[in-house]
């Protein structure tokens, strides 16, 4: 039995060409205990749920379909895109509205109620040519501050709703730590962890779980031993993958 704490089902199936029906059926066959579909936009929750529902409706075996409904859950959050940062006051209100509506719609077809906030946080990694829609030149001091504010708004929302938070942090550890300490809410996961042992210690001391993503499999050989030490350092009860 296993769990998957972070995937983007709509993105996987509609943009990456992954067979969603086969994926969900395989997860059910392997007795997946828990699967969390992650939000990245203030208003993407219902669309993501609808895509999952349509796939579940294609599952011919009712027991398999029930298994999928039982293990599938949803988060809602705002990844720090430039558009979301600039319109953060409005977008956080949209996020709150969607979360409230989802709670009213809890029914037997899906676990609609949001169980975590995220992913949200800070991203200062610049891909060549702004491949992910972000360029370093776009990030002046005003935008940097807006990104921090958007992150802290979501942390406050998680505290208000008593929900865990899924942190996205890339090349921005000190700023991330500052935001966490400003809000003082420490409950959740540091997703796709990409820092070192000292940073891991600080996260663990604050109470955060640490999740390792695909980087576990493709680290450069020169850094492999360093990465192995990091994996050994994180206690098994605080380790997610």
Question: Where are the regions a protein language model picked out?
Answer:
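Mid-domain alpha/beta scaffold segments of enzyme catalytic cores
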Residues: 1-241
């Amino acid at each position: 039995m296993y769990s998957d704490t972070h995937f983007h089902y709509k993105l996987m199936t509609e943009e990456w060409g992954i067979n969603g029906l086969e994926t969900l059926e395989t997860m059910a066959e392997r007795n997946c205990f828990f699967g969390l579909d992650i939000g990245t936009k203030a208003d993407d929750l219902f669309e993501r749920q609808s895509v999952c529902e349509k796939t579940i409706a294609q599952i011919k075996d009712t027991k398999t379909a029930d298994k999928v409904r039982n293990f599938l859950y949803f988060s809602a959050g705002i990844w720090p895109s430039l558009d979301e940062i600039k319109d953060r006051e409005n977008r956080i209100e949209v996020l709150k509205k969607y979360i409230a509506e989802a709670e009213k719609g809890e029914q037997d077809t899906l676990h609609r109620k949001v169980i975590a906030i995220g992913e949200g946080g800070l991203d200062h990694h610049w891909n060549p040519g702004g491949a992910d829609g972000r360029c370093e030149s776009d990030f002046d001091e005003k935008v940097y501050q807006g990104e921090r504010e958007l992150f802290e708004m979501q942390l406050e929302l998680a505290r208000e709703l008593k929900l865990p938070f899924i942190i996205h942090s890339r090349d921005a550890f000190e700023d991330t730590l500052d935001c966490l300490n400003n809000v003082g809410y420490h409950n959740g996961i540091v997703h796709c962890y990409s820092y070192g042992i000292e940073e891991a210690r600080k996260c663990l001391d604050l109470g955060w779980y640490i999740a390792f993503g695909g980087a576990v499999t493709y680290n450069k050989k020169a850094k492999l031993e360093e990465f192995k030490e990091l994996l050994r350092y994180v206690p098994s009860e605080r380790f997610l993958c």
